[in-house]
Design a protein with these regions (language model features):
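Short, acidic, Ser/Thr-enriched surface-loop or helix-capping motifs
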Residues: 103, 158, 227
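Glycine/GP-enriched mid-protein hinge/lid loop-to-helix segment characteristic of carbohydrate kinases
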Residues: 111-113, 119-123, 172, 179-194, ...
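ATP-binding/phosphotransfer module of carbohydrate and carboxylate kinases, centering on a glycine-rich
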Residues: 1-65, 69-111, 115, 119-143, ...
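Short glycine-rich anion-binding loops that position phosphate/pyrophosphate groups of nucleotides
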Residues: 153-156, 219-221, 333-334
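Short, acidic Gly/Pro/Ser/Thr-rich loop/turn segments
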Residues: 95-97, 155-157, 223
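Glycine-rich phosphate-binding loop and adjoining helix at the ATP-binding site
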Residues: 108-212, 338-350
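Short glycine-aspartate micro-motif
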Residues: 77, 87-91, 145-149, 213-217, ...
Length: 391
């Protein structure tokens, strides 16, 4: 076994071969010559390193397109072996909380709705029950599960596996990774939900080919995550990306974090629906409010536009701070593509330097109910597949 932080984990990948794994994650199948060129290795060095990975079963060889220089012989392609092992993901602050079983390609193979639990040990027991169900459904042995990733809303000390504070769960200074490991006997890694989403998008999602990108997680809370030069940016204490707590109205409404005027108090689904109710508009979802606005209801239009503009200004400031090539806005509760997102896009364009507009790709994605759990599984996948020091 290999030491990870303060915990023991399963066999990881040697740092000398990390670049091979990263290239295959980014590009899928590659020939040896293309792979060697992309990571700056000689063909002979690449052959030696890849042989070890093939013997371990981590990568596979397959026939590719025909190579005219070799008299019609098909080239041999290398790719990650999707079935080498599996990862568990648990999204604790999803509604409802979900678990998934994923493979080395990030595919969701089985899903499980976790039973409700609030106390950390009860959560660990619920995860253990979920693992039993997931491997039963997929008919795999427990020994092939390589790790558990846990994502939650709040401030997380990833290196120590501690939930420092989560208002959503009512936790403070909970060693949740260690608690889950004791119950499941599996290496467990915990992270902030937005950081988990960023990791998942880099490994298996829309940002695989991006070295510098940002994600904005839009739902009952707003979170952010940034990849800079191909690595997740955590900041000095691990709190980088807390855009939901950018001050947008100095002296404004008090947030659950203790500050006043945070973005979370104006642009989350919770805040928007509360303000809609105060205006006499009784709706249960932002999608319903968008539908009312589409029929010409001026109060709904103004509310959505104002909230969207606030988000847009914050995203614009973030773009100017980090200069990403890509910004992914991930809609986890069904905002849709209406007045809110249109206003967000306009505010971004109106508040960033002109030369950055054409240089920054902006994408909006709506996601499935198990999205956070899938993102959580990528925490464990990253820990196994990528050099430990990259965290």
């Amino acid at each position: 076994t290999e030491e990870i932080g303060h915990r023991q984990a399963g066999p990881g990948i040697s740092s000398s071969r990390t670049s091979i794994i990263e290239a295959l994650l980014e590009n899928g199948s590659m020939s040896r010559s293309d792979l060697a060129n992309s990571i700056g290795l000689s063909r002979s060095a690449l052959t030696v390193l890849s042989r070890g990975l093939i013997e371990q079963g981590l990568i596979l060889e397959s026939s590719g397109s025909y190579d005219n220089q070799q008299t019609g012989r098909p080239s041999i392609l290398l790719s990650l072996n999707a079935e080498h092992g599996y990862f568990i993901g648990a999204g604790l602050t999803e509604d409802p909380p979900m678990m998934v079983l994923t493979d080395f390609h990030g595919n969701s193979l089985a899903q499980h709705r976790m039973r409700d639990a609030e106390q950390p040990r009860a959560v660990a027991s619920a995860i253990e029950a979920g693992i039993t169900e997931l491997i039963r459904v997929r008919k795999i042995s427990r020994q092939r599960v390589l790790g558990i990733g846990v994502a939650l809303s709040g401030y997380v000390d990833h290196a120590r596996g501690i939930c420092v504070q989560s208002n959503a769960l009512g936790w403070r200074d909970v060693s949740i990774a260690e608690i889950i490991e004791r119950v499941t006997k599996l290496p467990t890694y915990v992270d902030n939900d937005a950081h988990a989403v960023a990791t998942g998008q880099k490994l298996f999602g829309h940002a695989r080919e991006s070295k510098n990108f940002s994600i904005v997680m839009l739902g009952k809370k707003i979170g952010g995550g940034h990849y800079i030069h191909g690595r997740l940016h955590r900041g000095h204490t691990g709190a980088a990306g807390e855009i939901g707590h950018y001050t947008v109205v100095p002296g404004g409404a008090r947030c659950g974090c203790g500050k006043q005027g945070c973005l979370d108090m104006f642009a989350t689904s919770t805040a928007i629906l509360e303000k809609a109710a105060e205006s006499g508009l009784k709706t249960e979802t932002v999608a319903q409010l968008e539908s009312i606005a589409a029929k010409g209801e001026s109060r709904a239009i103004e509310l959505l536009r104002h909230a969207g503009a606030m988000l847009g200004v914050v995203v614009a400031n973030s773009i100017q701070m980090n200069n990403p090539e890509l910004v992914l806005i991930v809609d986890v509760v069904g905002f849709g593509n209406g007045f809110f997102t249109t206003s967000t896009r306009q505010a971004i364009e109106n508040n960033i330097l002109p030369h950055l507009i054409a240089k920054t790709r902006l994408e909006l994605h709506s996601v499935d109910k198990d999205f956070l759990a899938r993102s959580a599984s990528s925490i464990a996948a990253h820990q196994f597949l990528i050099d430990q020091t990259s965290y």
